[in-house]
Amino acid sequence: MNQLLMQRLTRITDEERRLLDGQNSVDKGIYTDAKDFVVDSRKMLAKGKLIDIRPNTRFVHFPNHRHNYVEVIYMCSGQTTHIINSSVKIVLKEGDLLFFNQHTYHEILPASQRDVGINFIVLPEFFDVSFQMIEKDSVIGQFLVSTLCQEENEGRYLYFE
């Protein structure tokens, strides 16, 4: 990966600075106003945007949560450990991708400064056009059909090594 880009991605965010300065847990108010920990796209995306990126929060256990959008995590360097639906443990390594639909609960174990993951925050509407180009019989196509049609409330994920 481009060295300049990696320098930018490994920078300590304001949230991470507070964690390093002694705050010992995630400030849920950054992510949601709801009692249940559902990360809200309205807090993560600028109005009118369908997709955005942000770095994974490091240095702290990110508690069990889900999103009201599709999340795609790309691991740029190092590794992060994800516990999915309280039972499946996945260690995401450099170059790996992990997709979550809106019903998947997961938590993330603490990461170091060199463990750089990028979260793609994607509203389901983003896939309206791209979905037409994806073969519906493929693994990604089936995942998108179940995610976009919301006919089920089952937490699903895709993991690519």
Question: Where on the chain are the PLM-derived regions?
Answer:
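Gram-positive cell-envelope targeting signals
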Residues: M1-N2, V72
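Residue-identity detector for threonine
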Residues: T10-T13, I30-T32, S41, T57, ...
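Short amphipathic alpha-helical segments, especially helix-boundary/capping motifs
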Residues: A34-K35, A46-K47, I53-N56, H82, ...
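N-terminal regulatory/effector-sensing and dimerization cores
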Residues: K49-Q142
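A hydrophobic/aromatic-rich effector-binding and dimerization subdomain
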Residues: N2-L20, N24, S41-R42, A111-E161
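N-terminal, Lys/Arg-enriched amphipathic/low-complexity engagement segments
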Residues: Q23-I53
